[in-house]
Regions:
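Single conserved hydrophobic/aromatic residue that forms the stacking wall/gate
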Residues: 1-13
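Short, amphipathic alpha-helical segments
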Residues: 6, 29-30
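Glycine-rich phosphate/diphosphate-binding loops and the adjacent beta-loop-alpha structural elements
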Residues: 18-29, 38-161
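Short, hydrophobic alpha-helical segments
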Residues: 163-166
């Protein structure tokens, strides 16, 4: 997200008369800690993510649209991080608000995907702002080159304990 935020800011400098929105959908189902980590993208050379939405808090689509409109009115491009599991007040996942085929995994769980695309389409249709949706999906699971020393150590220890328990 740091790289994405930085690139988005560079585009903003070149194209400030026409704000754009990039919505990144991050895995996590009902736990938003990965999405919350998007706040860590802020640094001295990068403003970071503008808006972050987690599944632990009810998603208010009207408030979301108002915030996007407010930021866009300043002529700024923006980056928004949303958890795949964000839900509206009636308990439905945001992606369920779109007209799509519903998928379930081998365990019968709803396959969570499409919140970013739904929101991008809504922003484009209602606010006329160029918007992109990015669903990292499998890519975020396969980024072993980004693994921290802590992650490697914990995975090694858990694997060792599993072998001993078997």
């Amino acid at each position: 997200l740091h790289l994405l935020s930085r690139r988005q800011r560079q585009m903003c400098i070149r194209d400030s008369d026409y704000p754009t929105v990039t919505i990144v959908e991050i895995m996590g189902r009902n736990a938003g800690w990965l999405t919350a980590a998007a706040a860590l993208a802020k640094s001295d050379d990068c403003e970071g993510v503008d808006l972050i939405y987690l599944p632990e808090k009810v998603f208010d689509i009207d408030h979301f649209m108002a915030r996007v409109k407010e930021i866009a009115a300043k002529g700024r491009s923006m980056v928004i991080a949303v958890s795949e599991g964000i839900k509206v007040a009636d308990g439905r996942y945001v992606f369920e608000l779109s007209e799509h085929v519903e998928f379930v995994d081998a365990f019968g769980h709803k396959q969570l995907a499409g919140s970013a695309k739904f929101l991008a389409n809504k922003i484009g249709a209602e606010l006329g702002i160029k918007t992109r949706a990015i669903e990292l999906s499998t890519l975020q699971r396969c980024a072993a080159h980004m693994t921290s020393r802590t992650d490697i150590t914990e995975a090694f220890n858990v694997g060792g304990a599993a072998v001993k328990a078997a």
